[in-house]
């Protein structure tokens, strides 16, 4: 587990505060971007391991390494063994080798899924300070680095531990799609030498005469985001239909139980009036097995992904609307 220390003189004591900030070395950001550029294609997801340490309530990510791309046919590949060998090699060259989380690329903001939930729960259950970094290459390609850190909320961690994803379980935990993930602020830190080099390169960069401030973003981004949003809404609608079918089956079964109980009572009254022995009471639940309640976690995840798409569309449209108003004002001859 990542070491969590609090500097008090020359002693280190265990701190119980949660991770409130993520500090990432610039080299780690470049390695994540490079990993996607080399192995990511379209909607294909790339993943990797984050290494670092925890100081007070700050998680410092100092290194990372990628998961190699492999298919189901690669039966000889052992992912756990690969991670252990990589961390052992890093330890031999005196590089931070403490496991503090993982990273994953996303396609138009698509990352809220059961696979990510299960993976992050496994990481966070084993290593309390773990985070997952979500890198969006589409937004980054438009000139704005998109890298966010997420953790599962304590509420969702408890639900995953109990493994009760029924409607009653989620209601008891008082959890909604807004309560699944918590975003942790990110700070990108470079060494002084890298900052000096970046300053020198910026001075040497040629000055372009083109002003791209008012250029509108590609409409393909909005079109694709809306298409993905509609697909998730359709999935949520189908999931709601399945749950409503389950509720109807429950109601129908309750009516059948009630009718069976009434018939048995009437039959026993008739037998008693004829002086015959009453029929024994039977366990109604054995005769009418209740239908298996569907998991509501998938609906929760779909709702969370819908919310993510909406936030991306809102951000995209607000930026373009601002550019449109600025362009209109600049064309006004009275100004």
UniProtKB/Swiss-Prot annotation:
It is found in: Cytoplasm. Belongs to the eIF-3 subunit H family. This is Eukaryotic translation initiation factor 3 subunit H. One of its GO terms (cellular component) is eukaryotic 48S preinitiation complex. SMART domains: JAB_MPN. Residues 22-156 form the MPN domain. InterPro entries: eIF3h, eIF3h_C, JAMM/MPN+_dom, JAMM_MPN+_peptidase_M67A, MPN. GO terms for biological process: formation of cytoplasmic translation initiation complex; translational initiation. GO terms for molecular function: metallopeptidase activity; translation initiation factor activity. It comes from Xenopus tropicalis. Residues 254-287 are annotated as: Disordered. Residues 254-263 have a biased composition (Low complexity). Component of the eukaryotic translation initiation factor 3 (eIF-3) complex, which is involved in protein synthesis of a specialized repertoire of mRNAs and, together with other initiation factors, stimulates binding of mRNA and methionyl-tRNAi to the 40S ribosome. The eIF-3 complex specifically targets and initiates translation of a subset of mRNAs involved in cell proliferation. Component of the eukaryotic translation initiation factor 3 (eIF-3) complex, which is composed of 13 subunits: eif3a, eif3b, eif3c, eif3d, eif3e, eif3f, eif3g, eif3h, eif3i, eif3j, eif3k, eif3l and eif3m. Residues 267-276 have a biased composition (Polar residues). Keywords: Cytoplasm, Initiation factor, Protein biosynthesis. Its main location: cytoplasm. Disulfide bonds: none annotated.
């Amino acid at each position: 587990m990542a070491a969590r220390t609090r500097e008090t003189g020359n002693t280190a004591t265990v701190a119980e505060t949660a991770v409130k900030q993520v500090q990432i070395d610039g080299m780690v950001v470049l390695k994540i971007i490079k990993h996607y550029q080399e192995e990511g294609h379209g909607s294909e997801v790339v993943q990797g391991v984050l290494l670092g340490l925890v100081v007070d309530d700050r998680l410092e990510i100092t290194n990372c390494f990628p998961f190699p791309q492999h298919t189901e046919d690669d039966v000889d590949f052992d992912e756990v063994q690969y991670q252990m060998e990589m961390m052992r090699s890093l330890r031999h060259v005196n590089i931070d080798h403490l496991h503090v989380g993982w990273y994953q690329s996303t396609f138009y903001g698509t990352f809220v899924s059961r696979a990510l939930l299960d993976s992050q729960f496994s990481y966070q259950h084993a290593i309390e300070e773990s985070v997952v970094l979500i890198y969006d290459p589409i937004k980054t390609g438009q000139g704005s680095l998109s890298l966010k850190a997420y953790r599962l909320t304590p509420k969702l961690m408890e639900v995953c531990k109990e493994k009760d994803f029924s409607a009653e379980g989620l209601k008891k935990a008082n959890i909604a799609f807004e309560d699944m993930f918590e975003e942790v602020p990110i700070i990108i830190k470079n060494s002084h030498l890298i900052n000096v080099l970046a300053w020198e390169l910026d001075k040497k960069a040629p000055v372009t005469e083109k002003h791209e401030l008012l250029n509108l973003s590609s409409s393909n981004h909005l079109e694709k985001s809306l298409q993905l949003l509609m697909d998730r809404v359709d999935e949520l609608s189908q999931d709601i239909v399945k749950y409503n079918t389950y509720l109807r089956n429950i109601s129908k079964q309750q009516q059948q139980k009630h009718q069976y109980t009434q018939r048995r009572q009437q039959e026993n009254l008739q037998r008693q009036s004829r002086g015959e022995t009453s029929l024994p009471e039977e366990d109604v639940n054995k005769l009418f097995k209740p239908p298996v309640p569907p998991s509501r976690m998938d609906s929760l995840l779909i709702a969370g992904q819908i919310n993510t798409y909406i936030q991306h569309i809102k951000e995209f449209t607000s930026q373009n609307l601002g550019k449109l108003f600025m362009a209109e004002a600049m064309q006004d001859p009275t100004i």
